[in-house]
């Protein structure tokens, strides 16, 4: 996504990184105050003057030992929200990039490496961008909670999901599904002062949207009447994912083991311990990566996915 403003990359690439501004995102439904990522953005003029060599080197290095890579906020290769240093995200503006050159480099380097590229095309996206990425052979990202009909806001039927994408129930910018079902994402943002509406209104809207998904799961026979425990609902949600035409389906580690704590809260720096929340089971027992492979809950959810995907 970017580099630390005081890191080695920022020093070595200071000729092609903009100073006095940071990259971020404008306000949207889930981040009502916008986001400031505290990262210096690429300068499009200097990239072009240098034939995009620093960007090519970066993509080449990422793909050198990878069979696949996910590019966070890939829409930033089309236009990126620049925020004056010290100003709130709402004071930012979009700066355009030569997406033909930058996406072309990503596609070329991926082809050379024989790797798949997944772009996170979420947030404020221009309508044509997803089609453009697809035409260049890049997969998009579909998150269950965001997949709603454009007009009715009802859950998007499984058969109408995109084929060329990576689908998941959760994302790193949301709580694990157990926490999302409990409304943790609303309460956390309220406690951090990130909401622009009364918390009761946010909770009411959130409950309606989750209720619509539960009704859809029951309509499809994936969730029985009366079943509402988080483990049962999570299993049903992943079974739904497996019925979409998506080329790739992702199972979050946190969902696999039943953790509900938020790993990352957009729009925060020191206010929340982002990326410092160790993986744990529902009882709070810390888990190492090796523990996941012997975790009964994770094994059961993986088996459900395997059975649905293989028919």
Task: Mark where each language-model region is.
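Structured C-terminal cap/extension of enzyme domains
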Residues: 258-311
């Amino acid at each position: 996504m970017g580099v630390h403003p005081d890191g080695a990359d920022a020093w070595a690439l200071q000729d092609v990184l903009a100073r006095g501004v940071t990259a971020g995102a404008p306000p949207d439904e889930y981040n009502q105050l916008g986001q400031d990522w505290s990262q210096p953005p690429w300068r499009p003029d200097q990239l072009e003057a240098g034939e995009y060599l620093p960007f090519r080197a970066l993509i080449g290095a990422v793909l050198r030992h990878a069979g696949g890579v996910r590019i966070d906020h890939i829409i930033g290769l089309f236009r990126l929200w620049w925020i004056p240093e010290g100003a709130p995200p709402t004071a930012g503006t979009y700066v355009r990039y030569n997406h033909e050159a930058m996406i072309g480099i990503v596609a070329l380097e991926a082809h050379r490496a024989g790797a798949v590229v997944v772009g996170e095309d979420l947030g404020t996206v221009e309508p044509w961008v997803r089609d453009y990425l697809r035409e260049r052979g890049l997969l998009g990202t579909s998150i269950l909670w965001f997949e709603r009909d454009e007009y009715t806001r009802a859950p998007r039927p499984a058969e109408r999901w995109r084929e060329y994408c990576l689908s998941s129930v959760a994302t790193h910018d949301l709580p694990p599904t157990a926490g999302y079902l409990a409304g943790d994402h609303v309460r956390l943002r309220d406690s951090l002062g990130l909401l622009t509406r009364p918390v009761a209104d946010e909770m009411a809207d959130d409950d309606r949207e989750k209720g619509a998904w539960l009704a859809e799961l029951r309509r499809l026979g994936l969730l029985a009447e009366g079943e509402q425990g988080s483990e049962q609902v999570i299993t049903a949600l992943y079974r739904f994912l497996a019925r979409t035409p998506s080329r790739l389906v992702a199972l979050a580690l946190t969902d696999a083991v039943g953790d509900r704590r938020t790993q990352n809260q957009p729009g925060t720096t020191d206010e929340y311990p982002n990326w410092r929340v160790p993986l744990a089971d529902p009882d709070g027992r810390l888990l190492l990566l090796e523990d996941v492979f012997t975790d009964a809950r994770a094994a059961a959810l993986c088996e459900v996915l395997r059975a649905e995907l293989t028919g």
